[in-house]
Amino acid sequence: MDILPLPRDEVRSVVEGRGCASRIPVLLHQWTYPPAFGNREAEVRALCDRFPQDAQVIPYQAPDIHVGRPDDPEYRWVNYDKPAGAEDGHGIDDRTAIQDWSQLDGVIAHFPNPDYAGLFASKPQPDGRYRLAHWWYGLFERHWSLRGMTNALMDFYTNPEEVHRLYRAYTDFFLRFTERAREELQADAIYWTDDLGTQSDVFFSPLCRVPDYAE
């Protein structure tokens, strides 16, 4: 180990704007996936071990879009199986799980339970670092993952009420996730992702979604 991680309290102080740390806190493993390096995987893992990041990043077991978990078949984002060939020839941003908004009632009626016992498959013991519960796919990311990017951007204008209902259900799931992260992981913060901006501007008009993000 070439550097020692910053203590939890120092990072918390920086994040909360109460003071500085002995150096800039670093989260450097976000896009460093050792298996992606093929025959250099061991070398990359060793490098990451030499330069540990200043937080324990703890992921959650996200529902799959179509496939439930063995111990909870309804722990999935939509309440029906993937049609055969649905993804053939389609990029990840052009796949449409919710093909028509008439399916929304069933999706919401069978929305995954945020009290699912396996929500946090790994609960590592505190190691002295700041603890981050990691959530992939914020509101808009989950929206386009279910509707496809082009449909999602049009939905803001053509089906705003349906979008709000979907976001409401997703927000309720996320709020319970937040509570459990604090209770079960003693998380200091939530690290979540969303597709809100481009290199030059926000991705869509803030007027469309500010109320959904306010909570």
What does each of the following model-derived ranges do?
Residues 30-32, 61-64:
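Short beta-alpha junction loops
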Residues 55-62, 89, 161-166:
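Short C-terminal domain-edge/linker segments immediately following a structured domain
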Residues 64-114, 125-134:
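A contiguous, low-structure linker/loop signature
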Residues 1-39, 102-215:
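Active-site loop segments of alpha/beta catalytic cores
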Residues 37-48, 68-75:
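Glycine-rich loop at the start of a catalytic domain that most often binds anionic cofactors/ligands
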Residues 8, 28, 57-59, 76-85:
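N-acyltransferase acceptor-side catalytic subdomain
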Residues 43-62, 184:
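Catalytic domains of carbohydrate-active enzymes, especially glycoside hydrolases
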